[in-house]
UniProtKB/Swiss-Prot annotation:
Its main location: cytoplasm. SUPFAM superfamilies: Glutathione synthetase ATP-binding domain-like, PreATP-grasp domain. Its cofactor is Mg(2+); Mn(2+). Residues 141-347 form the ATP-grasp domain. It catalyses: 2 D-alanine + ATP = D-alanyl-D-alanine + ADP + phosphate + H(+). The gene is ddl. It comes from Treponema pallidum (strain Nichols). Pathway: Cell wall biogenesis; peptidoglycan biosynthesis. Pfam families: Dala_Dala_lig_C, Dala_Dala_lig_N. This is D-alanine--D-alanine ligase.
């Protein structure tokens, strides 16, 4: 039995989605493990939830919420490790693994991951760098391009540059991409702040709306395409559990269609694909996962055009676990039951933590061999001894 600390809520536009995902994860984990719930408010304050909240959740008598009891406000101890990183009411709480069921900003973007690294506790999901890269759609697309993966043509700009050169950017978008266009914040999930535009008139308002959610906006060519989602897990070797499909009723799969109770979007746990298409998409999913250095789990999304062209769209490092989320359904269809999936994710977290803990961090604790020392001696190599920045990016 593992002591799991489950984080949910968060200071994010996807707060409510996180709560719904956490409900599924908590109910699954509590069947085999000890679970401590920590709810994070929209203001970013952490509160440990009473044991009765978990009991009621697991028996299905109440929905998950966040009780803000100041006596149960969480204190964090950097370096506290599994025995003392989390302190509640003056008492340290044992935590074998943290499961951050957090979506979007301050959850999937490397911020919480960095905090958990400083606490020195294992956690489910990707590390700091991989989380940050995956959350930043611009950086992810650049890395995928460098790795030779297909992505839709795109343009991006910062808010300050947009303010100074608005008309130039509009002209650039019309020349390089052409209408219709798809506008979205570089760092936001669940289609928050995203919109499709057909002409110039709504373009500027769409960009301004996207800037409400991030300092960088990404604009790409809008395509009518099938939306294919692949579920992956592992630290290496990686597993592609399958490919599902989302059939949106609107211009695109927006927040309401993803999470509204009255959503009319259809999801197919097994996408109807030809064998060659399935192999192509799952191979690209593995390469996209590897290119960003992902670990634990992720959902990689694709566009499949009528012409047969396939484009990597984006990646989600903490996929939804709501009642309509494809990730757990794809895994279950592949023969991985929810309890087994949770066991795999906890195992990956502890495995990755052990591997990182084995790395050296103290230069003085090691005696380097003379040949190694000379190879890294600036005086021995001259002023330009460090050539790492000039090395080309590896291609998959």
């Amino acid at each position: 039995m593992v002591h799991v600390t489950l984080l949910y809520g968060g200071r994010s536009a996807e707060h409510d989605v996180s709560v719904r995902s956490a409900r599924f994860v908590a109910r699954t984990l509590c069947l085999q493990h000890t679970v401590m719930l920590i709810g994070i408010t929209r203001r970013g304050v952490w509160y440990a939830q009473p044991a009765c909240a978990l009991e009621q959740l697991c028996t299905g008598t109440v929905a998950l919420s966040i009780q803000e009891d100041e006596k149960r406000r969480v204190c964090l101890v950097p370096g506290g490790g599994t025995a003392g990183a989390f302190v509640i009411a003056g008492m340290p709480c044992v935590t074998d693994v943290v499961f951050p069921v957090l979506h979007g900003s301050y959850g999937e973007d490397g911020t919480v991951q960095g905090l958990l690294e400083m606490l020195q506790v294992p956690y489910v999901g990707c590390g700091v760098c991989a989380s940050a890269l995956a959350m930043d759609k611009v950086k992810a697309k650049m890395l995928w391009q460098a790795a030779g993966l297909p992505v839709l043509p795109f343009v991006f700009f910062r808010k300050d540059a947009w303010r100074m050169h608005m008309q130039e950017f509009v002209a650039q978008l019309e020349t390089r991409l052409g209408y219709p266009l798809f506008v979205k914040p570089a760092q936001a999930g669940s289609s928050v702040g995203a919109s499709a535009v057909q002409t110039r008139a709504p373009l500027i308002p769409a960009i301004e709306a996207a800037f409400q959610w991030d300092e960088v906006v990404l604009v790409e060519r809008y395509v009518r395409a099938r939306e294919i989602e692949c579920a992956l897990s592992g630290n290496g070797p990686y597993t592609v559990h399958g490919a599902g499909e989302v059939i949106a009723q609107g211009a695109f799969y927006d927040y309401e269609e993803k999470y509204a109770d009255a959503s009319v979007a259809r999801v197919l746990v097994t996408a109807p694909l030809e064998t060659a298409q399935y192999e192509q998409i799952t191979t690209l999913a593995l390469r996209a996962y590897e290119a960003l250095g992902l670990t634990g789990l992720a959902r990689v999304d694709f566009f499949l055009l009528e012409t047969g062209e396939v484009y990597v769209n984006e990646v989600n490092t903490m996929p939804g676990f709501t009642s309509i989320s494809l990730f757990p359904q794809i895994c279950q269809a592949a023969g991985v039951a929810p309890q087994d999936l949770m066991a795999q994710l906890l195992s990956c977290a502890r495995e990755r933590f052990a591997a990182r803990a084995a790395l050296s961090t103290d230069l003085h604790a090691h005696v380097c061999a003379p040949s190694v020392t000379a190879a890294h001696d600036p005086d021995a190599q001259g002023d330009d001894w460090d050539q790492r920045d000039s090395n080309p990016l590896p291609t998959a």
